């Protein structure tokens, strides 16, 4: 059988995949080799490790299927179990300033920048323990009543300033209207003065003509 003929030529695979990029523990001619014997390098510790050192999610990133064949990715970006970040089992509560277990926080509070435990959340809603009601709770992001008074004072001051600015703008508009009307009246008076000057010149010219005829 002529394997060099065009009939038996293997089609080219995509450029981002390599058919022989796998590194097996045994030789290439060893029997029973499969994908589980493949070694992959971790992108963080830069160590070549087997399938036992990777999770299923990370291991699925190393291979793909092309025309029914399992093909390894040329440069897979995978992280071994040792280098993967661990899940936090405790969270710092910003309300009571204590480190508590993750089970004491609701799922919504676990993903915010200022997490609060369930006890502190209930205490703010006036549904918590009586011991917590004895100590006045101050939200570090909102402040106490004095901060609220300051905010009200600042808001009132800004309102007064805005009203004063509106009054000043109204006065300036009236002044502009008056000045514009005065300019128009002045221009009309100047136009009347020009007409009177022309009439006077006409009278002088007519008088000059009469005197010349008499002579």
Curated annotation (Swiss-Prot):
Gene3D superfamilies: Stc1 domain. Its main location: nucleus. The keyword Cell cycle applies. It comes from the Eukaryota. One of its GO terms (molecular function) is protein-macromolecule adaptor activity. The keyword Cell cycle applies. Keywords: Cell cycle, Meiosis, Nucleus. Residues 159-202 are annotated as: Disordered. It is found in: Nucleus, Nucleolus. Residues 164-176, 187-201 have a biased composition (Acidic residues). One of its GO terms (biological process) is meiotic cell cycle. GO terms for cellular component: chromosome, telomeric region; nucleolus; nucleus; pericentric heterochromatin. Required for meiotic chromosome segregation. This is Meiotic chromosome segregation protein P8B7.28c. It comes from Schizosaccharomyces pombe (strain 972 / ATCC 24843).
């Amino acid at each position: 059988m002529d394997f060099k003929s065009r009939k038996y030529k293997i089609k080219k695979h995509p450029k981002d995949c390599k058919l022989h990029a796998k590194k097996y523990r045994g030789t290439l001619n060893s029997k029973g080799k499969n994908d589980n014997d493949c070694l992959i390098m971790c992108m963080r510790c830069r160590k070549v490790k087997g399938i036992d050192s990777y999770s299923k999610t990370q291991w699925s990133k190393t291979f793909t299927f092309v025309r029914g064949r399992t093909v390894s990715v040329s440069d897979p970006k995978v992280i071994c179990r040792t280098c993967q970040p661990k899940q936090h089992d405790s969270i710092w509560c910003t309300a009571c300033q204590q480190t508590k277990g993750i089970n004491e926080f609701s799922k919504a509070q676990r993903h915010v920048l200022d997490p609060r435990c369930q006890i502190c959340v209930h205490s703010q809603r006036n549904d918590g323990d009586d011991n917590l009601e004895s100590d006045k709770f101050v939200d570090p992001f909102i402040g106490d009543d004095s901060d609220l008074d300051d905010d009200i004072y600042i808001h009132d001051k800004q309102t007064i300033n805005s009203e004063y600015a509106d009054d000043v703008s109204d006065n300036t508009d009236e002044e502009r209207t008056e000045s514009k009307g005065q300019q128009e009246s002045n221009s009309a008076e100047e136009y009347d003065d020009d007409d009177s000057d022309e009439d006077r010149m006409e009278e002088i010219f007519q008088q000059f003509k009469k005197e010349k005829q008499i002579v």
